[in-house]
Design a protein with these regions (language model features):
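Bacterial signal peptide processing site
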Residues: 14-17
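Helix-start (N-cap) detector for alpha-helical repeat units in TPR-like alpha-solenoids
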Residues: 32, 39, 76-77, 110-111, ...
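Alpha-helical segment of the N-proximal tetratricopeptide repeat
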Residues: 37-71, 88, 149, 156, ...
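Residue-level recognition of tetratricopeptide repeat
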Residues: 47, 84, 118, 156, ...
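Position-specific recognition of the canonical hydrophobic site in helix A of tetratricopeptide repeat
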Residues: 50, 87, 121, 159, ...
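Structural signature of tandem alpha-helical TPR/SEL1-like repeats
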Residues: 54-64, 88-101, 123-135, 161-173, ...
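Structural marker of alpha-solenoid helical repeat scaffolds
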Residues: 71, 105, 139-143, 177, ...
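Canonical tetratricopeptide repeat
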Residues: 81, 115, 149-153, 187, ...
Length: 373
């Protein structure tokens, strides 16, 4: 497992909580009582486990953080880091609970609000996520560059929900008070993409390139635009350009692989996905897709091996693990004629996959069709 970082994927938020000193953020001015020495020692042990890394880092850190909180439950940083561990493991209910306890102590702390917003978002609780994004933005000074990043996250939430007018309004309000940047143009382009307003998408994405010609996310969006316009070669070239700008920008390579899978070009998709997995072995979504490519090439044993690995290694409540369980079931039922094994995997999926997982209804219908019980 990679060395634990607290929600590195979150906009305007990253890194583990600092040592328990004074609460951070311009809204947190109240004087704080000293942390009990025994609790501080446990907290430091948790941070040491994080720094050292290794497969047991998260479990060790979690145990130490809980021990610290038994001694002194006012250490908001410990609640924050517990939430981060839960979020990384896909346990969004626990993450929300832990972040909420951190906010009860360090009220209005922007990184914690952003972290909780991301957990709510992944749970599908749009209203709660939106409220936290909006509160985080209000807590920031107008000239804080992170305010524009928070706005793009909120706008993307609204875009995903189909609330395009609200998403555009959020960006316009932010531009009026805090100015424009390439990320705002890029998000606006993605909103227009979702609305199939391709000329406007092209216009604003071109402006994004003018502001930051080295941001791979812009070329990723342009590649998606080209694909929507029926220009596959241009799309692939733009995906490649995004990757050339930042070899660690996996989104472009993954999107290219997804386009290849959709086109039935399983061999090229496999090449792209294998490159992702080689660079990031714990990118379980990529491993699941690699299994799909293997299945398309009729390499059923290899596909099963990929999905078995995800089931074994991925966080128990994560979407990739649920995807792997579903794919194992359909592989056995629809491709290898292992009806008994497929039924067992379907039942396991229904027992272990999150209730909000995209394939749950399909699994329930499939289970009735094959008479699981």
């Amino acid at each position: 497992m990679k060395k634990l970082l607290v929600l590195v994927a979150l906009a305007a938020c990253g890194g583990t909580a600092k040592k328990p000193e004074a609460p951070t953020g311009r809204q947190a001015k109240a004087k704080r009582d000293p942390v009990k020495p025994a609790a501080y020692k446990e907290f430091e042990a948790a941070m040491r486990a994080v720094r050292l890394g290794g497969p047991e880092a998260s479990e060790t850190a979690r145990a130490r953080l809980r021990s610290a909180l038994k001694i002194d439950n006012t250490i908001w940083e410990a609640w924050f880091d517990l939430g981060a561990i839960a979020w990384k493991e896909g346990d969004d209910d626990e993450a929300v609970d832990d972040f909420s306890k951190a906010l009860d102590i360090n009220k209005g702390h922007t990184p914690t609000l952003m972290a909780r917003a991301e957990a709510y978002r992944r749970e599908g609780k749009k209203k709660e996520a939106r409220a936290d994004y909006e509160t985080a933005a209000k807590n920031m000074d107008e000239d804080d560059p992170n305010k524009r990043d928070v706005a793009t996250r909120l706008a993307s939430l609204l875009r995903d929900a189909g609330d395009y007018d609200d998403a555009v309004e959020v960006l316009r309000d932010t531009v009026r008070t805090s100015g424009i940047n390439a990320k705002i143009y890029t998000e606006l382009g993605q909103i227009y993409l979702a609305q199939k307003r391709y000329e406007l998408a092209q216009l604003v994405l071109s402006k994004a390139v003018q502001m930051d010609a080295k941001d791979p996310a812009i070329y990723n969006a342009l590649a998606i635009l080209a694909a929507r316009q029926g220009k596959p070669q241009e799309s692939f070239q733009l995906f490649d350009q995004a990757v050339s700008l930042d070899a660690n920008f996996i989104d472009a390579r993954f999107n290219k692989a997804s386009a290849l899978l959709d086109a039935g070009d399983y061999a090229r998709a496999k090449t792209e996905l294998a490159a992702i997995v080689e660079k990031r072995p714990d990118d379980y979504a990529a491993v699941v897709s690699l299994g799909v490519a293997q299945r398309g090439l009729k390499a059923f044993d290899e596909a099963k091996k990929d999905w078995d690995r995800v089931v074994k290694e991925a966080p128990k409540k994560s979407a990739p693990r649920a995807d792997a369980l579903w794919n194992l079931a359909t592989l056995k039922l629809d491709f290898t004629e292992d009806a008994a094994g497929g039924k067992a995997d379907l039942e396991r999926y229904l027992q272990e996959a999150p209730s909000s997982h995209a394939r749950r209804q399909d699994a329930e219908n499939k289970c009735k069709e094959v008479k699981c019980h």
